Amino acid sequence: MALNLVGWNVVLDSDNADELSAFYEKLLGWTRFPGEEFTVLANINQKGFPTWITFQQVDNYVPPVWPATTDEQQQMEHLDFHVENVEEAVKYALSCGATMAGIQYDEGWRVMIDPSGHPFCLLPPPPWIK
């Protein structure tokens, strides 16, 4: 048995959910739907069921540390964005307000940090989707 999905999303905590959703709106070109409790950013133009990111305001939010250490806040998840050109994507992400992580583990992809401290990766497409 499998779930009968009608969509899926990931939730990102932030001490400034509005700013973080605006960053991803610019980075991804998705549509933002502000709400009272959450802000949602959705890819409404894709085929099939929709994908969206929910941004949750957390007043005592502690950003994760990259790379992880045992004595500081660790990431609970991270986003991977597969792009046609990693270096162009890095330049664009930087112009949107991301920073490049100080430590990179591979030459083929880049770890970036969003304005709330969440790491995300920019990678080439995997071979199975080409």
Task: Describe each model-derived feature in a short phrase.
Residues D114:
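Short, acidic, Ser/Thr-enriched surface-loop or helix-capping motifs
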Residues A68-A93:
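Mid-chain, well-packed structural core segment of small domains
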Residues W30, F38, V65-M76, W109:
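Tryptophan-centered motif/residue detector
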Residues A2-N4, V11-V58, A89-V111:
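Core segments of cupin and vicinal oxygen chelate
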Residues Q57-N60, P125:
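Acetyl-CoA-dependent GNAT
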